[in-house]
């Protein structure tokens, strides 16, 4: 049952990114990023990385929601465009969904997929095993995982927030 839940969460995760890439209005872009952040952290928490999922979600909401709040405030429209109002946007959205379905069928057909990384152990990178010592709780080990195995997540998140703020400042400054 949990495999199906993770599969459904993964599909929602990718569909939300396809929805973000074909967003017609900044309001919907921020909405689907919040949904994708919550679903992604749910996937991490399903594999046992509760603290890492919580930290990523808090960093995500703390940083990116502020950036998209400013974006929405600067580019607000009285009648925002939706996905079905433009045939090009709807076509890009449907093409992205078709590509996702083809990728899912390819992954389900083969046992091990090695596109960029090898995906044999799905959640192994999100779990920091404590071993046989029962003196440590999962939350303490989650903090250790955030700064050891999850250091690249913190670096990428910080860099993404910096780039996002600089892009928003450049767009809103205008000429």
Swiss-Prot record:
Keywords: Electron transport, Membrane, Mitochondrion, Mitochondrion inner membrane, NAD, Respiratory chain, Translocase, Transmembrane, Transmembrane helix, Transport, Ubiquinone. InterPro entries: ComplexI_Subunit6 (IPR050269), NADH_UbQ/plastoQ_OxRdtase_su6 (IPR001457), Nuo/plastoQ_OxRdtase_6_NuoJ (IPR042106). One of its GO terms (molecular function) is NADH dehydrogenase (ubiquinone) activity. It catalyses: a ubiquinone + NADH + 5 H(+)(in) = a ubiquinol + NAD(+) + 4 H(+)(out). It is an enzyme of class 7 (translocase). The chain crosses the membrane at residues 1-21, 25-45, 47-67, 88-108, 149-169. Gene3D superfamilies: NADH-ubiquinone/plastoquinone oxidoreductase chain 6, subunit NuoJ (1.20.120.1200). Its main location: mitochondrion. It is a multi-pass membrane protein. It is found in: Mitochondrion inner membrane. It holds the Pfam family Oxidored_q3. Belongs to the complex I subunit 6 family. Core subunit of respiratory chain NADH dehydrogenase (Complex I) which is composed of 45 different subunits. Core subunit of the mitochondrial membrane respiratory chain NADH dehydrogenase (Complex I) which catalyzes electron transfer from NADH through the respiratory chain, using ubiquinone as an electron acceptor. Essential for the catalytic activity and assembly of complex I. This is NADH-ubiquinone oxidoreductase chain 6. The lineage of its organism: Eukaryota, Metazoa, Chordata, Craniata, Vertebrata.
């Amino acid at each position: 049952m949990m495999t199906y839940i993770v599969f459904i969460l993964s599909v929602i995760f990718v569909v939300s990114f396809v929805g973000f890439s074909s967003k017609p209005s900044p309001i919907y872009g921020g909405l689907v990023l919040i949904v994708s952040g919550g679903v992604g952290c749910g996937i991490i928490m399903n594999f046992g990385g509760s603290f890492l999922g919580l930290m990523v979600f808090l960093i995500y909401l703390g940083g990116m929601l502020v950036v998209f709040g400013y974006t929405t405030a600067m580019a607000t429209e009285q009648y925002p465009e939706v996905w079905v109002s433009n045939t090009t946007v709807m076509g890009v959205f449907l093409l992205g969904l078709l590509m996702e379905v083809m990728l899912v069928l390819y992954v389900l057909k083969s046992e091990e997929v090695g596109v960029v990384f090898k995906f044999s152990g799905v959640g192994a990178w999100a779990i920091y095993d404590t071993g046989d010592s029962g003196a440590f709780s999962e939350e303490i080990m989650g903090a250790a995982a955030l700064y050891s195995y999850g250091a690249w997540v913190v670096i990428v998140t910080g860099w993404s927030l910096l780039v996002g703020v600089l892009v928003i400042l450049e767009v809103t400054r205008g000429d």
